[in-house]
Amino acid sequence: MNNPFIFGKAVEGSYFTDRQEDAKRLHANLSHGINTILISPRRWGKTSLVKKVTAEIDSKDLKTVFIDVFSCKSEYEFYRIFATEVVKQTSSKIDEWIETAKIFLSNISPKFSFGSDPMNDFSLSFEWNEHDDTEKEILQLPEKIAEKKGIRIVVSLDEFQQVAFFGDQLTFQKKLRTIW
């Protein structure tokens, strides 16, 4: 008999079992704009739970952004991925992505790179100027887009402990707390 369970990666659909109470509570928190932190040992299904709930609440009026911080090797890379994902999830077409980046990231000279599937595969880079408000502008991006478009945005940061490996993790965390 084959094992019906999947281990070691996020699951969805029929592989996601139980956790109804957790999902219900997280759904309520995210729908009502309540900052929520999930803490448990590794491999207990936090990522699967967040992805399930954010897929359920994602709509025309409430957009969800999922960022795997584990893939970020530096503070700069976090900002780049953060900006890319926020723009991607809050805009539906290439020209809208570009327009959104131009409007909301105008002070940092955004540059787009498109992959083989330009509708889904693109990344954003920018000129980094430590003397301006680049970090602040990027971290405020969801709030500014939400206000302009009349929507709400939920941002999920998975594997947040990865910031401990950034150059100056305490300063980075202080920036996040100050702006968010």
Show where each model-derived region lies.
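Well-ordered alpha-helical segments embedded in enzymatic catalytic cores
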Residues: 21-25, 137-141, 175
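A generic membrane alpha-helix/interface feature
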Residues: 37, 86, 176-177
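P-loop NTPase nucleotide-binding core
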Residues: 41-44, 48-155, 160-163, 169
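Substrate-engagement module of ASCE P-loop NTPases
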Residues: 143-146, 175-180
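Substrate-gripping "pore-loop 1 plus following alpha2 helix"
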Residues: 168-176
